[in-house]
UniProtKB/Swiss-Prot annotation:
It is found in: Cell inner membrane. It holds the Pfam family BacA. It is a multi-pass membrane protein. Its main location: membrane. One of its GO terms (cellular component) is plasma membrane. InterPro entries: UppP. Catalyzes the dephosphorylation of undecaprenyl diphosphate (UPP). Confers resistance to bacitracin. Disulfide bonds: none annotated. Keywords: Antibiotic resistance, Cell inner membrane, Cell membrane, Cell shape, Cell wall biogenesis/degradation, Hydrolase, Membrane, Peptidoglycan synthesis, Transmembrane, Transmembrane helix. It comes from the Bacteria. Belongs to the UppP family. It comes from Shewanella piezotolerans (strain WP3 / JCM 13877). It is an enzyme of class 3 (hydrolase). This is Undecaprenyl-diphosphatase.
Amino acid sequence: MDTFQVIILALIQGLTEFLPISSSAHLILPAQLLDWQDQGLSFDVAVNTGSLLAVVMYFRKELYSMFMAWTGSIASGKQTQESKLSWWIILATIPAVIVGFTAKGFIETYLRNIEVIAATTIIFGLLLWWADRMQRQGFNEFQVGWKKALVIGLAQAMALIPGTSRSGATITAALMLGLSREAAARFSFLMSVPVSLGAAILVTKDLLSSGQAIDYQALGLGIVVSFIAAYVCIHYFLKIISKMGMTPFVIYRLVLGAVLCGFIFL
């Protein structure tokens, strides 16, 4: 990959990773429009690491409080709202881990194609619109409980289907369960930490065992660009949804889905 490709693809990944619009739907566009080849494992390591660092940096205070409360609850047996939230995040991660390990080959072989991505982009966009429209109660993330956490975790596992969008699926589920827009987004972002960490570790392991030459320039540039893009994205996304809701992202998904359908049928 040349420098231009690294910057463009890292920007796309960073900007779309935490928006409910599907990063895979966007990463397929350069391949369709510009005939770019697969990004390679070095790039995958870079964008996973950059996205992880962005969400950890943005929520560093919350994550520190949660970690300290969680370790304290193990030692003392006493639960606080931060320790409960930590346990719910762990619980919500389990379905994606199970599905990821058992169905990764099937997903990569049969579902990573433009037809599936176009369909899921549109379908889950409509589900996001419906969930946002029906949202009324406005619970915060400290009121999730283990049952809601498990349901949101199942939605995250479903998001392994390309085009679904991890943040889109989890925010949709959280809104359906009565969380406020901001709480749904925060819970989704916090859920991304163990998932992104696991993904970064697995892709790094694949890279080291593949025997591929490591492109350190692409690796470093991809981390920096995806980190900056993801950090900015998180900050402004939380501001946008508090004022405008999910409608702009729903419209965008429908337009994007239509564009992808155009590549299929035209």
